[in-house]
């Protein structure tokens, strides 16, 4: 009878009693009980019979170094009883031989199966490793593609932002250029309008102080030139007759508005009417005579009258009149306009309403007052003082 055998992956045959270890062409047996290593199968069976009493019929003790052969077994069997000992001897002889033959046969076949199984296992392991490597490579490629796509998206977003910033900058530049052009055009229009207004209203706004009077010749020249309106004078209260030898007498009446009224004798008025009917001289001669008369006029003691030092010449040769009241410093092309402006700085109210006690610094305010309060729409000559 034989022992059950199990072939493992490490080329070892396991039994209930011993372990068959294969190594190349030779093998050895390890006892499970005492872990003794034996070189041959006979030594192994002798060891288990002698040391561990496996056969239960062999009483002879053998040393571990003694050789175990069939002659010793036969001699032991002959010395024993015929019945039981013969059966024991037959068992002792037949079992080791059968075990040796079967173990050798099964070891070769099972070793081939184990080798094939190991090859299959190794092949499967290699396939799994290759699949894992391919999966890792695919993941790496996918991660690279995702990173590349993200980089492209970021570049596109950055490019779009830069393009938007450039578009906004262009729009702002265009708006700024349009605003500058519009401002320049409006400034040109305003300057043109101011120049036109000055040229159109230069004649109307020339107002000389009422206390200044001109000779009949100068008045005739001014009327002939057509540059200044000649308005009738206000009727003053009766005054004593002037002394002989004087062309005209100037009388100052102290009123609530400090107005100065000049009177002209009848003979002077007649001369004016005759001169007005005469031939009109040239405009240049009238302007020259008017400038000379203005230089010969006495200076007014009022603080609102322009001084001789207030005229300033510019780079282009034009003469400007500068307001010297404290820190005003406004420039005017005409002296009369500067004097009209300087009334703003003073407390003088030269224009009185003949219907009430109201007084005003400018004639326009008096005209508005008359229209709103008294519903009067008369000509300016009725409310304005003497102007030259």
UniProtKB/Swiss-Prot annotation:
Residues 138-168, 240-265 are annotated as: Disordered. It is found in: Nucleus. Its main location: nucleus. Disulfide bonds: none annotated. GO terms for cellular component: nucleus. A zinc finger (C2H2-type) spans 29-52, 321-345, 351-374. SMART domains: ZnF_C2H2. It comes from the Eukaryota. Keywords: DNA-binding, Metal-binding, Nucleus, Repeat, Transcription, Transcription regulation, Zinc, Zinc-finger. InterPro entries: Zinc_finger, Znf_C2H2_sf, Znf_C2H2_type. GO terms for molecular function: DNA-binding transcription factor activity, RNA polymerase II-specific; RNA polymerase II cis-regulatory region sequence-specific DNA binding; zinc ion binding. Residues 138-165, 249-265 have a biased composition (Low complexity). May be a transcription factor for genes having (A+T) stretches in their promoter and/or enhancer regions. Binds to AT rich DNA. This is AT-rich binding protein. The lineage of its organism: Eukaryota, Metazoa, Ecdysozoa, Arthropoda, Hexapoda. The gene is ATbp.
